[in-house]
């Protein structure tokens, strides 16, 4: 979830269904226009909004850092997300349980684990490159 609009839409649908929906908030740590996610400075107002809801529970953060060949830069981005994760957990928001930090994909999952990820997405490393010609 990367916006207040989406968060409130999920709240509305979860209320209709009579459930509490677990979500992750997505952070666009590199400020890339090609990626979704809230800018890091917008995470706090998004958490404030989430904490005021009755049918949403924030379970953590997710992020995809910019693709680059600079291992040190990649780790800096991942470390920044980890610091946001820790700070969000320390703030004691209602309905916020920072348990999951989803960052790292096939190309950088080792760095992500070193920097605190609890969930990595490594489909390409397991299954290989996608063949888009078969559509």
Task: Give, region by region, the residue ranges found by the protein language model.
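Conserved active-site alpha-helix within GNAT-family acetyltransferase domains
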Residues: 110
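C-terminal helical cap(s) of enzyme catalytic domains, especially alpha/beta-barrels
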Residues: 113-135
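Conserved alpha/beta-domain cores
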Residues: 1-107, 115, 129
């Amino acid at each position: 979830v990367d916006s207040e609009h989406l968060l409130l839409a999920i709240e509305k649908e979860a209320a209709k269904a009579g459930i509490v929906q677990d979500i992750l908030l997505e952070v666009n740590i590199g400020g890339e226009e090609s990626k979704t996610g809230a800018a890091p400075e917008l995470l706090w107002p998004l958490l404030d909004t989430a904490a005021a809801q009755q049918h949403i529970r924030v379970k953590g953060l997710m992020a995809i850092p910019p693709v680059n060949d600079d291992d040190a830069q990649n780790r800096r981005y991942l470390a920044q997300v980890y610091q946001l994760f820790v700070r969000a957990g320390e703030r004691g928001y209602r309905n916020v349980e920072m348990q999951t930090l989803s960052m790292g994909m096939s190309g950088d999952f080792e760095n992500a684990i070193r920097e605190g990820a609890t969930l990595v997405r490594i489909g390409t490393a397991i299954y290989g490159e996608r063949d888009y010609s078969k559509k």
